[in-house]
């Protein structure tokens, strides 16, 4: 009974207290096709992406890739997320974790919305959950959010001036 109570408490905390979402949005004066071609040109990430420095591997649903992020003002990290969604010109989503699932998991989503007038709304968000999330909330609110913003601005610049 004690074991069951502990499991239920951890599950409750993991679904409420131990969650965090950060989200950024930017309007880009370019078609979703143009934005997508830049977003998924992973070979150029080291020189063109100020936040995600590299993505290696076959970016296909179900596959694991290797990604390196370098948030401004924070230590960079390399991790191996699994691709959850890849819908051309619309969405790329992966799920990564620190050491094991439930400790610090991040579901990263890039979403492109066709505004129907030659422009795109680009949404970048990440849903974090796990036991360590409360310890990293400040870093997520500042460093990761700034990294998202920097990446979004660079994507906009590249899409609008290429």
Set out the residue ranges of the language-model regions.
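Hydrophobic ligand-binding cavity/cleft-lining segments
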Residues: 4, 14-56, 60, 150
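Generic structural detector for well-ordered beta-strands
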Residues: 25-29, 68, 82, 111
């Amino acid at each position: 009974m004690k074991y069951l109570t502990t499991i239920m408490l951890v599950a409750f905390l993991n679904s409420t207290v131990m969650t965090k979402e950060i989200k950024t949005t930017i309007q880009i004066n370019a078609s979703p096709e143009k934005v997508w071609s830049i977003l998924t040109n992973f070979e150029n990430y080291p020189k063109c992406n100020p936040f995600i420095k590299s993505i290696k591997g076959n970016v296909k649903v179900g596959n694991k890739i290797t990604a390196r992020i370098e948030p401004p003002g924070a230590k960079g990290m390399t991790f191996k997320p699994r691709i959850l969604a890849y819908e051309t010109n619309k969405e790329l989503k992966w799920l990564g974790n620190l050491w094991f699932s439930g400790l610090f998991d991040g579901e990263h989503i890039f979403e492109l919305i066709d505004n129907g007038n030659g422009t795109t709304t680009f949404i970048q968000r990440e849903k974090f959950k796990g036991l360590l999330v409360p310890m990293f909330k400040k870093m997520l609110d500042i460093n990761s959010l700034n990294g998202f913003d920097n990446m979004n601005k660079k994507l906009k610049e590249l899409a609008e001036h290429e």
